[in-house]
Amino acid sequence: MSDDQSLSEVEMSPVGSEDPSLTPDPLPPHAHSSPDDDDDDDEEEEEETKVKKEQDSEDERFPVCIREAVSQVLNGYDWTLVPMPVRVNGGSKSKPHVKRPMNAFMVWAQAARRKLADQYPHLHNAELSKTLGKLWRLLNENDKRPFIEEAERLRMQHKKDHPDYKYQPRRRKNGKPSPGEGDGSSEAEGGAASIQAHYKNSHLDHRHGSPMSDGNSEHSTGQSHGPPTPPTTPKTELQAGKSDGKRDGSHALREGGKPQIDFGNVDIGEISHDVMSNMETFDVNEFDQYLPPNGHAGHPSHIGGYTSSYGLTGALAAGPSAWALAKQHSQTVADSKAQVKTESSSTSHYTEQPSTSQLTYTSLGLPHYGSAFPSISRPQFDYADHQPSSSYYSHSAQASSLYSAFSYMGPPQRPLYTAISDPPSVAQSHSPTHWEQPVYTTLSRP
């Protein structure tokens, strides 16, 4: 084992053997690199000679007079004033292209470029072109004459070399627009977006303003169904649009008959005491247009008037509707009592039922909204059984106690005037055939 180990050590160690055949001779430090260095030197010399030959050939391309003229012009300009950014490498042209013959300026520019490329290799092409253009404009006719003559010679030579030559400019790629076009397009897009946003806002105002708009406008716009307390939105025009829309929609409701508002989303219980205490913002005279026209209360031909008036007050989202209902109820009571006093001949006709029995509204047929609520029995609507007519006068002057004025409409008894289950069994109420001027003394504004 010891002999094997010694043999292996001798084999592994580079200097352990004395046999010159096993160990290579130590080489001088320049032995491996000398051939490569010689090759590199030869290649550099060849490249230098090639560059010199190319420069000589390029110099031979221009006559001596052109080179002298270029030197004469360039010697008078300090090229150290031109900024020298990093040169950008241009893309190589894959397809050969026959160039146009150079004009006088191109002859001057190319000859000057070749001379300046050796002296100032870091000049940027754009800055060089601008400077050459400035110098060309400063030259007089005598300085330009050699370049003009050379350009004419090149044109004749080009005509001989390419007799069928036709100038075909390359088409500009439409992928990238110019900076000016990009700015214009962005401005146009911004203007269109602002116009669209303005139209969208106005469209929302229109949909909110008119009750005769789409039935799903309240759902689609995402507005709450609470009372229209200002300021619910930052825009004050929206409130004006709402009031105008209601005013316009009242005529359409009277003429059309069936309103487009879903009463399932309207609840009088949503009225707060703050809204009741701020009722001075609503004009009392504004709600006179919602009162039904002259006619018999129980007559079927005038049911549409009551239906449209109640549909519109329901569309007012609880706040104004409570005010209009209180005003209407009190005025109807006052009118009926006035008729009782004036028409003494028909006293027995009015004593058959209480003076407030005309508030039963038994013939109010709302089949469109009847499915939203269960059928209501008659006693919930018979106001004469629950409350005397004097409650309208005792609570009409108190804005904060309008809930007590509507004590017949407690939270569990808010049917929103749906169809009554037994309309045939209830006697139709009687009201005067002609409406008199409303009495405003019975309901004072808070």
UniProtKB/Swiss-Prot annotation:
Q: What is the tissue localization of expression for this protein?
A: First expressed at stages 13/14 at the lateral edges of the neural plate, in the neural crest forming region. By stage 22, neural crest cells migrate in the cranial region and strong expression is seen in the crest cells that populate the branchial arches as well as those migrating in the frontonasal region. Also strongly expressed in the trunk neural crest. Expression in the otic vesicle begins around stage 25 and persists until at least stage 40.
Recount the PTM note.
Sumoylated.
Q: Where is this region: Dimerization (DIM)?
A: 56-96
The record's note on what follows loss of this gene reads: Loss of neural crest precursors. Also an increase in apoptosis and a decrease in cell proliferation in the neural fold.
Q: Which segments show compositional bias classed as Basic and acidic residues?
A: 153-167, 243-257
Positions with biased composition (Acidic residues): 36-48
Where found, per UniProt? Cytoplasm; Nucleus
> Where does it primarily localize?
cytoplasm
What is any one of the record's Gene Ontology cellular component terms? cytoplasm
| Crosslinked residue numbers (Glycyl lysine isopeptide (Lys-Gly) (interchain with G-Cter in SUMO)) | K52, K341
What ranges does the record list as Polar residues composition bias? 213-226, 426-446
Q: Where is this region: Transactivation domain (TAM)?
A: 217-303
Domain comment in the entry: The transactivation domains TAM and TAC (for transactivation domain in the middle and at the C-terminus, respectively) are required to contact transcriptional coactivators and basal transcriptional machinery components and thereby induce gene transactivation.
Note the subunit structure: Interacts with the sumoylation factors ube2i/ubc9 and sumo1.
Name this polypeptide is given: Transcription factor Sox-10
Q: Which organism is it from?
A: Xenopus laevis
